Amino acid sequence: ITQHTVRQTSSIETYYEEEEYLYTYPDGTTEIRTREVERRRLHISLRASSPDEVMSSIGFTEEQRQWASYIHDNIADNQTQGDSPAVDMGDVTFTDAEIPVVYYAQTDGRWSGISYSGSTIGIAGCGPTSVAIAASTLTGQVITPPEVAAWSEATGHATYGNGSYHSLIPDALAHYGLTVQRAGASSAQQLVDALSSGKLVVVIMGPGTFTTSGHFIVLRGVTVDGKVLIADPYSYSFSQREWDLPLIMREAKRSAGSGGPFWIVSS
C-alpha cells in the first residue's frame, strides 16, 4: 500500500509583549507610554503518515494488515489515460493482427453511463470491457460490456468504487467457455508466442503510460518487427498504435492477484 494519510495537529501559544502607545493628557499634551499586551500564536503541524503507521495507530493485527494489503493490491483502479470519446463507436473490428479483433470502448455512449461498481462503465468498466473484447472475438458471439458488467456485479467480482477484482478476468472468460492461462510478469517470450498463434492476452497495467493506478487492456497481436498491438477499452487512439513489448512488461502491475498480470486467452 503506497498512499499516505496527512494528519494535522494544532496548538495555541499565549505570550505577552510590550508595545508603545500615545497617551493624551486632559490639557491636550501627549507622551509615548508602554503597556503589556497579551498575544496568541497558532501553531499548525502537518505530518504525512504511511499506511503502516496508520494501521499501527489503529491497532491492526498482522492478519488485518495482510488483508488490507490484499484488498489494495487486488482491485483494478479506474485512473486511465489517453483519449475518452463519449460517443457511439459503432461496430469496430481491428484486422491488422493474426485474427480480427472486436473492439469495444468503455466510454461508448451506448453504455458509458450504465451503473457499475458504484460508478459507471465509462469510468470503472475497463475490466468488463476487456472481457467483452476477448470473449466476443474468440467466441464469435456478441458479448457487450453491459452484459459482462451485470455478470460481474451478480457474482461478486465488482468492488464498490474501485472497478473490478482481478479475478474477474479468468472467471468471466471461463464463464464464456474460453481457456485462460495465467502468465507472470517476466514471461515476454510466452506472450509473443501466444499472440503469434492467434491468442489474446488480457493484462492489468500499473502506473505509467496507460494509467495512474490500474487499468485492464487487451494485447491483440504482434507485428513482424516485434511491436505489440493492443485494444485499450479507454483509448481508441492508443489501440491504433504499435507498442514496445518492454514497456508493456515494465508497466504491467506486478502485484496483480488471480494469476496476473497477464492472462492468455484462447478458444
Region annotations inferred by a language model:
Residues 53, 59, 66, 70-73, ...:
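Noncatalytic regulatory segments and standalone regulatory/sensor domains
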Residues 108, 130, 134-142, 152-156, ...:
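Sec/Tat-exported extracytoplasmic proteins
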Residues 160-169, 210-215, 238-240:
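Extracytoplasmic/secreted cell-surface and envelope-processing proteins
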